[in-house]
Amino acid sequence: YQYQVFSKSPVSGSPTVIKVADPFSNLIISSYDDNQIPENSFPNLPKFPENQIGEFTFINKSEKYDWNITEFDKPKKEDLIIYEILVRDFDKESSFQNLIDRIEYFKNLNINAIELMPVMEFEGNESWGYNSSYHLSLDKFYGTQNKLKEFIDLCHQNGIAVILDLALNHVFGRSPLVKMWMDDPDNNSWGGPSNENPYFNQSA
């Protein structure tokens, strides 16, 4: 589904009518990026609606994940030994499955935490991830929700915490919370937050 938002008094430089996916989506299908997502990373990717553009919320009815580790004692801050990973560049597969396959490598490093650079839905597929568009939706290029959970579960089984790097204010263009209060002087549905945006600062 998709929302069509009308504004009787739009902020200056912002469109009067926009179509956006749900800002709180946990799965986004996109006319911009989905044709570049490998089948082995996200099997059975929902098909984008014909004759539509933009992004839609897809209600995800994926199977429940059964955690092996339901309680995990995280390391104290002063004891953390963190290994930071950009999933895209860690290995050629660029996927959560790739991280799962390398668990022995992580164990041999004698680390106790892995920090994932942003894995939330971001603008495009080739990015460091610090330009999030949907903060509660995983970027499908890396894999499914359950595959990320499997990786976290496996790390916990081996005494490794997983930290998610969040970039909350680095947003523009495709974020619905930007589009509803957007600085769009060219009237092309593209821009950054306006000075009236209640969620984001104009300068990060």
Regions found by a protein language model. Name each.
Residues 1-80:
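The feature marks proteins involved in alpha-glucan
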